[in-house]
Structures are given as structure tokens and as C-alpha cells.
UniProtKB/Swiss-Prot annotation:
It comes from Actinobacillus pleuropneumoniae serotype 5b (strain L20). Belongs to the bacterial ribosomal protein bL21 family. PROSITE patterns: RIBOSOMAL_L21. InterPro entries: bL21-like, bL21-like_sf, Ribosomal_bL21, Ribosomal_bL21_CS. Part of the 50S ribosomal subunit. Contacts protein L20. This is Large ribosomal subunit protein bL21.
Length: 103
């Protein structure tokens, strides 16, 4: 059984027991969170597709960790001008463990 849900403007395909990195959520570590914007639920041959969401379906998860991702370097290089600009960015994330899919 797996489900596709939306969080932080992105869609995630998850199954029970899986650990997923999402955009930062303002929830403390160890707390439970429910995602009710479930777009699709597949249970064997039974496929439920929402228009746009599946009514009554939700994905239940537990927050495992909060953190920042690896550094991404942004470089602007101007040829023949002896000029360049360098910048770095680390995106915040929330790691959740999927504990249940209800449809």
C-alpha cells in the first residue's frame, strides 16, 4: 500500500514505515502530524485517485528530526572581468516517519 500526498508545494510517494524529508514544518521532534491532502491511494489492485484530493484519506507521520541540508554553492562568474561572486545556501528540512495511511 502506498499513497501520494502534497506538502510544501511538493508531492511525495510514501509507504508505511518510510522516512521522508519534507520542507520545514513548525512541529517539534517526536510529535505526530497528519497530512490530509492525499492525491492518490493504492492498495493492491484498489486505486483511489482524488479530484483533487481523496475524500477521507490521510497520511499519519511522526517527526523524527529537524535540520539543514547540505550546502549549495551559487557562483556568478564574469569572464574577462576579474570578477566573481560566491554565495551559499542551506535549506531547512523536517524528517518524518510514515506511521499509517488511512483511506
Amino acid at each position: 500500500m502506498y499513497a501520494v500526498f502534497q506538502s510544501g508545494g511538493k508531492q511525495h510517494r510514501v509507504s508505511e514505515g518510510q522516512v521522508v524529508r519534507l520542507e520545514k514544518l513548525e512541529i517539534a521532534t517526536g510529535e505526530k502530524v497528519e497530512f490530509d491532502s492525499v492525491l492518490m491511494v493504492v492498495n493492491g489492485e484498489d486505486v483511489k485517485i482524488g479530484a483533487p484530493v481523496v475524500a477521507g484519506a490521510k497520511v499519519v507521520a511522526e517527526v523524527v528530526a529537524q535540520g539543514r541540508g547540505d550546502k549549495v554553492k551559487i557562483v556568478k562568474f564574469r569572464r574577462r572581468k576579474h570578477s566573481r561572486k560566491q554565495q551559499g545556501h542551506r535549506q531547512w528540512f523536517t524528517e518524518v516517519k510514515i506511521t499509517g495511511i488511512q483511506a
